[in-house]
């Protein structure tokens, strides 16, 4: 992707602001539109749904060539991955800003991380580095930990919370892959609201970051 930028654009459904992720050799948004997006993760390309891609694509969707495609109806839970002649392995590493994270063709059309969030990872890391004091971050609904790793790499003490034991396990693996075992990240599998109520009773204060899942 090109350097991080923000620009406004008008579509038939209104005006939007587009954020472009910064220099990321292992990820590339190749095309998007008509409710789908074509992306590259490392050496593999994927065609998967994206309800926010409301505009016409640069090339017709039926001409896209991908190593994997998530097919099915509008219901993500009923869809499935379909692979061509160059199927990806069960998981493979991608790097960003000195971090290494595993990606995979997961359920619900996901890839194990959200590359569009990298603008937020970079923003959070810059805030932590410029804080001039010790920083604690509570990352709710943290998934596989990209934000937590970026914050820990920048020097914060991180509490990572997710309700999925599998996601917590992937996050721990990503911490090891990124050589951040010397950084403080508490990996907690719990309900977010219950955890917050306990933290409030204990009088603990964090910088709060959350990405609430679709309900």
Spans of model-derived segments:
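Conserved alpha-helix/loop element of class I SAM-dependent methyltransferases that forms part
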Residues: 115-133
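Non-cysteine beta-strand/loop elements that form the S-adenosyl-L-methionine
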Residues: 209-214
């Amino acid at each position: 992707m090109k350097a991080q930028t923000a620009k406004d654009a008008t579509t038939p459904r209104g005006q939007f602001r587009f954020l472009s992720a910064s220099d990321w050799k292992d990820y590339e948004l190749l095309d998007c539109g008509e409710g789908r997006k074509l992306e590259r993760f490392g050496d593999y390309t994927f065609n998967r749904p994206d309800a926010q891609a409301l505009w016409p694509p640069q090339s017709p969707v039926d001409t896209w060539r991908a190593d994997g495609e998530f097919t099915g109806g509008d219901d993500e839970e009923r869809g499935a991955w379909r692979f061509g002649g160059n199927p990806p392995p069960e998981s493979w590493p991608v790097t960003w800003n000195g971090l290494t994270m595993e990606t995979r063709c997961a359920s619900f059309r996901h890839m194990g991380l959200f590359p569009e969030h990298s603008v937020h990872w970079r923003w959070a890391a810059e805030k932590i580095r410029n804080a001039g004091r010790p920083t604690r971050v509570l990352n709710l609904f943290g998934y596989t930990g990209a934000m937590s790793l970026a914050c820990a790499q920048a020097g914060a003490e991180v509490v990572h919370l997710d309700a999925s034991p599998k996601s917590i396990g992937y996050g721990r693996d990503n911490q090891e892959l990124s050589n951040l075992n010397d950084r403080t990240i508490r990996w907690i599998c719990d309900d977010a609201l219950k955890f917050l109520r306990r933290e409030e009773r204990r009088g603990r204060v964090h910088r709060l970051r959350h990405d609430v899942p679709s309900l």
